[in-house]
Amino acid sequence: MAKQPTRARKRVRKQVADGVAHIHASFNNTIVTITDRQGNALAWATAGGSGFRGSRKSTPFAAQVAAERCAEMAKEYGLKNLEVMVKGPGPGRESTVRALNAAGFRITNIVDATPIPHNGCRPPKKRRV
């Protein structure tokens, strides 16, 4: 006897009005994650995953493209307001926030949550080029 074909149900996306954009801007890459208020990830994108490799990955433009891609995915959830949390010293800090603003989100506040050590690990030695 043949198996009855199971119908694939269309997944219903939950509607979220407010979210948090977590931006991790390192010297080598920028990671943008948009979550709901509870911290459940809705969408994420990276500069490396957006088609930039090598030294181009660590540019403000690559971070901007990653933020735009992440914003497109997050719009499917009906997001309107964003709180932005920025971590790290990388070059994509400012351009990512500008891209999220240009994508149509209302940015309620911006928090700089860069971890600062209380004299923890020894930093990398200075480059000699």
UniProtKB/Swiss-Prot annotation:
Keywords for the protein's UniProt record, in alphabetical order: Ribonucleoprotein, Ribosomal protein, RNA-binding, rRNA-binding
Superkingdom: Bacteria
PROSITE patterns: RIBOSOMAL_S11
Gene Ontology cellular component terms for the protein in this record: ribonucleoprotein complex; ribosome
InterPro entries in alphabetical order: Ribosomal_uS11 (IPR001971), Ribosomal_uS11_bac-type (IPR019981), Ribosomal_uS11_CS (IPR018102), Ribosomal_uS11_sf (IPR036967)
Xref: Gene3D superfamilies: Ribosomal protein S11
GO molecular function ontology, one term from the record: rRNA binding
Biological process terms in GO annotation: translation
Signal sequence region: none
Assembly, per entry: Part of the 30S ribosomal subunit. Interacts with proteins S7 and S18. Binds to IF-3.
HAMAP family: Ribosomal_uS11
Family to which this protein belongs: Belongs to the universal ribosomal protein uS11 family.
Role this protein plays: Located on the platform of the 30S subunit, it bridges several disparate RNA helices of the 16S rRNA. Forms part of the Shine-Dalgarno cleft in the 70S ribosome.
Protein name: Small ribosomal subunit protein uS11
UniProt gene name: rpsK
